[in-house]
Amino acid sequence: MDKKSARIRRAARARHMMREQGVTRLVIHRTPRHIYAQVIAPNGSEVLAAASTVEKAIREQVKYTGNKDAAAAVGKAVAERALAKGVQAVAFDRSGFKYHGRVQTLADAAREAGLQF
């Protein structure tokens, strides 16, 4: 089993648990250059809020899009957008990535901006 398939297996197991609980999820995806975050409704078919380093507004705030500063900007932005839609509590879906580095920074920034998880 290679690294990618192991990560996907971990993500599938976590998503199955969250789907059974019926909670709103904060889903992240990480690439070497960008980081993406979405708040997905409990039914799994509706994106309530989203933010990523691909957006022009966030790219203007940071010097480089693949570091912790960029992840913090995305975390803050997605939390503000989710709170504006009335979402206050979410489950953190790290998509099988380790809770370390940019993933942890995004989560901490979202918590500081007011999301609860």
UniProtKB/Swiss-Prot annotation:
Family annotation (CDD domains): Ribosomal_L18_L5e
This protein's UniProt keywords: Ribonucleoprotein, Ribosomal protein, RNA-binding, rRNA-binding
Name of one Pfam family that matches: Ribosomal_L18p
GO biological process: translation
This protein's GO CC annotations: cytosolic large ribosomal subunit
Protein's UniProt keywords contain Ribonucleoprotein: yes
InterPro entries per record: Ribosomal_uL18_bac-type (IPR004389), Ribosomal_uL18_bac/euk (IPR005484)
GO molecular function: 5S rRNA binding; structural constituent of ribosome
Subunit composition and interactions: Part of the 50S ribosomal subunit; part of the 5S rRNA/L5/L18/L25 subcomplex. Contacts the 5S and 23S rRNAs.
The family this protein is said to belong to: Belongs to the universal ribosomal protein uL18 family.
Protein role: This is one of the proteins that bind and probably mediate the attachment of the 5S RNA into the large ribosomal subunit, where it forms part of the central protuberance.
UniProt cross-references to PANTHER family, sorted A to Z: 39S RIBOSOMAL PROTEIN L18, MITOCHONDRIAL, LARGE RIBOSOMAL SUBUNIT PROTEIN UL18M
Protein name: Large ribosomal subunit protein uL18
Higher taxonomy: Bacteria, Pseudomonadati, Pseudomonadota, Gammaproteobacteria, Pasteurellales
Chain's gene name: rplR
